[in-house]
Amino acid sequence: MANNNSAKKRIQIAERNRIQNRTYKSAMRTLMKRCFEACGAYSEKPSEDAKKDIQNSMNDAFSKIDKAVKTGVLHRNTGANQKSRLTSVVKKTIEPVVK
């Protein structure tokens, strides 16, 4: 346990930041799941509305990821990895491979 006041305050600040980061990451994951679900819906029933839903959900997820990187919740490489993962899934869904 911390002995001086500054160490006690650092413990409080670390706990506060942990909770804030946790909620931010949870919101980011939720937006990513929505994008994946939109891709699944488009795969089952392709339409222009479904395509717009994919684009909107991807833009929302990208925005949240970028803000998480900017505020220090995520490392920039982790953010880039998540965005790459989303992009590849969306690209495979919208533009199927033609042989």
Swiss-Prot record:
Belongs to the bacterial ribosomal protein bS20 family. One of its GO terms (cellular component) is small ribosomal subunit. The keyword 4Fe-4S does not apply. Binds directly to 16S ribosomal RNA. Gene3D superfamilies: Ribosomal protein S20. It comes from Prochlorococcus marinus (strain SARG / CCMP1375 / SS120). This is Small ribosomal subunit protein bS20. GO terms for molecular function: small ribosomal subunit rRNA binding; structural constituent of ribosome. Pfam families: Ribosomal_S20p (PF01649). Keywords: Ribonucleoprotein, Ribosomal protein, RNA-binding, rRNA-binding. One of its GO terms (biological process) is translation. Coiled coil: none annotated. InterPro entries: Ribosomal_bS20, Ribosomal_bS20_sf. HAMAP family: Ribosomal_bS20 (MF_00500).
